[in-house]
């Protein structure tokens, strides 16, 4: 699931992941609908601009892109926190792969 701003970035990330990881089901939602979308879809992974308490409590793998406009991104992968100074597409794809491994 992608729920980050700006919208073009959110949709671009979703499109690229869909092309490069066709087995992954991707939902793009507005950031303000993140919590209700987590309840509705029960995603294995979320990419967002702000990690909410609901996200942290219900999703095992998530990426918070540049929180509070900070120069880094934060990921949680099965309870392990990782920071990326300049997260790249390959990093996101690797996290998608790890989310799939954890889901199986």
Q: Where do the language-model regions lie?
A:
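Acidic, metal-coordinating helix/loop segments flanking the phosphotransfer/catalytic sites
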Residues: 29-45
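Hydrophobic beta-strand segments of well-ordered beta-sheets in folded domains
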Residues: 1, 42-47, 59-64
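Short, glycine/charged-enriched secondary-structure capping and boundary segments
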Residues: 14-17, 56-63
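Short, well-ordered alpha-helical microsegments
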Residues: 10, 34-35, 54-55
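Short, polar loop motifs at secondary-structure junctions
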Residues: 31-33, 48-53, 67-70
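Short loop/helix-cap segments at secondary-structure boundaries that form the rim of catalytic
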Residues: 38-40, 52-60, 72-75
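Ser/Thr/Gly-rich flexible loops in soluble cytosolic domains mediating phosphotransfer, phosphorylation
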Residues: 61-104
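Short, charged N-terminal beta->alpha structural module
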Residues: 1-31
């Amino acid at each position: 699931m992608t729920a980050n701003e700006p919208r073009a970035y959110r949709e671009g990330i979703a499109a690229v992941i869909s092309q490069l990881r066709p087995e992954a089901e991707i939902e793009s939602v507005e950031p303000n609908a993140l919590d209700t979308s987590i309840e509705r879809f029960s995603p294995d992974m979320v990419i967002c601009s702000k990690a909410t308490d609901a996200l942290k409590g219900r999703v095992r793998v998530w990426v918070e892109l540049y929180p509070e406009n900070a120069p880094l991104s934060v990921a949680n992968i099965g309870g392990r926190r990782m920071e990326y100074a300049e997260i790249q597409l390959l990093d996101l794809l690797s996290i998608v792969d790890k989310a799939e491994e954890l889901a199986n």
